[in-house]
């Protein structure tokens, strides 16, 4: 039995949950999320707690026990508080801006790069170099932030590129060069 899967999830008072078959739906002040749980995973919803249980002792159910509990916990956190990721752009002439709801990046290419965010994801730009990706689904927020970073990942020589806030980029020394 998973150590994480054994933990009980506490429900805040402003949320409502519904469990039909293998689908759980969580509704809160920020929105609604639903997810289909894998076969072999069951839920026990009592008052203001959720317990994730496995039906049987199959290897697959045991492997997915902790994962399912964490996914449900992230759904509850998302619809009550939301998630965000911050990115920074570093480099001379590198900048970003918002046009309608699309993110436009000028990061050293001969063209600008446009990114259209998926539904329920909001992208904000501060000071042309700081980007905030926010939404209720942790998985989608992380995926959009990763997509933005992959357009121009930080390079190790000058550190130019798009990085997560607080990310450490290992720097390298340049080529030694030929002495005269």
UniProtKB/Swiss-Prot annotation:
Chief localisation class: plastid
One GO MF term attached to the UniProt entry: structural constituent of ribosome
Keywords: Chloroplast, Plastid, Ribonucleoprotein, Ribosomal protein, RNA-binding, rRNA-binding
Organism superkingdom: Eukaryota
GO biological process assignments: cytoplasmic translation
Cell compartments where the protein resides: Plastid, Chloroplast
Alphabetical list of InterPro entries matching this protein: Ribosomal_uL6-like, Ribosomal_uL6-like_a/b-dom_sf, Ribosomal_uL6_a/b-dom, Ribosomal_uL6_bac-type, Ribosomal_uL6_CS
Annotated GO CC locations: chloroplast; cytosolic large ribosomal subunit
Functional note: Binds 23S rRNA.
Family, similarity comment: Belongs to the universal ribosomal protein uL6 family.
Quaternary state and interactors: Part of the 50S ribosomal subunit.
Name of the protein described by the UniProt record: Large ribosomal subunit protein uL6c
Natural source organism: Pyropia yezoensis
Lineage: Eukaryota, Rhodophyta, Bangiophyceae, Bangiales, Bangiaceae
Gene (name only): rpl6
């Amino acid at each position: 039995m998973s150590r994480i899967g054994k933990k009980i999830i506490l429900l805040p008072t402003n949320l409502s949950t519904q469990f039909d078959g293998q689908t759980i739906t969580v509704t809160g002040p920020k929105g609604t999320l639903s997810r289909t749980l894998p076969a072999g995973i069951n839920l026990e919803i009592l008052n203001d707690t959720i317990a994730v249980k496995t039906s049987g002792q199959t290897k697959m159910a045991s492997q997915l026990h902790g994962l399912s509990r964490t996914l449900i916990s992230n759904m509850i956190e998302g619809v009550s508080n939301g998630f965000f990721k911050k990115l920074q752009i570093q480099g001379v002439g590198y900048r970003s801006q918002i046009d309608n709801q699309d993110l436009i990046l000028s990061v050293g290419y001969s063209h600008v790069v446009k990114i259209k965010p998926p539904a329920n994801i909001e992208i904000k730009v501060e000071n042309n170099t700081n980007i905030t990706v926010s939404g209720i689904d942790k998985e989608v927020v992380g995926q959009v932030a990763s997509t933005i970073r992959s357009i121009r990942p930080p390079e190790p020589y000058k550190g130019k590129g798009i990085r997560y806030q607080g990310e450490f980029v290992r720097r390298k020394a340049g080529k030694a060069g030929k002495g005269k």
